[in-house]
Amino acid sequence: MGKAGNIEHVEERVESEVMPPSMYKVILNNDDYTPMDFVIEVLQLFFKKTEEQATDIMLAIHHQGKGICGIFPFGIAETKVAQVNQFARQNQHPLLCSLEKA
């Protein structure tokens, strides 16, 4: 008869550190054709800004060339950029929304 071997049970814990997702700034860029009221509408509709917040961001866009609408994980930022650009084109405005790593 064979000899019964020792069975050793090894339990290994693997601890992985969950990294927070990379964050991205959603940016509206200035142009010479999109009305200021439309920019305010976009900020309220897509970024849930109050009229005062939207006006402040719109003025930053107008004077500084661009303004930050919000900071989001990549997937959300990418979706918001696509939605804003599509909405602008549907309304025949050249407003450009883009994203930058935060």
Curated annotation (Swiss-Prot):
InterPro entries noted in UniProt: ClpS (IPR022935), ClpS_core (IPR003769), Ribosomal_bL12_C/ClpS-like (IPR014719)
Coiled-coil ranges from the UniProt annotation: none
Pfam families hit by this protein: ClpS
Annotated signal sequence range: none
GO biological process: protein catabolic process; proteolysis
Domain of life of the source: Bacteria
NCBIfam families membership: PRK00033.1-3, PRK00033.1-5
Oligomeric and partner information: Binds to the N-terminal domain of the chaperone ClpA.
Function as written in the Swiss-Prot or TrEMBL entry: Involved in the modulation of the specificity of the ClpAP-mediated ATP-dependent protein degradation.
Family of this protein: Belongs to the ClpS family.
PANTHER family, alphabetized: ATP-DEPENDENT CLP PROTEASE ADAPTER PROTEIN CLPS, ATP-DEPENDENT CLP PROTEASE ADAPTER PROTEIN CLPS1, CHLOROPLASTIC
Protein name: ATP-dependent Clp protease adapter protein ClpS
Organism: Shewanella woodyi (strain ATCC 51908 / MS32)
Name of the coding gene: clpS
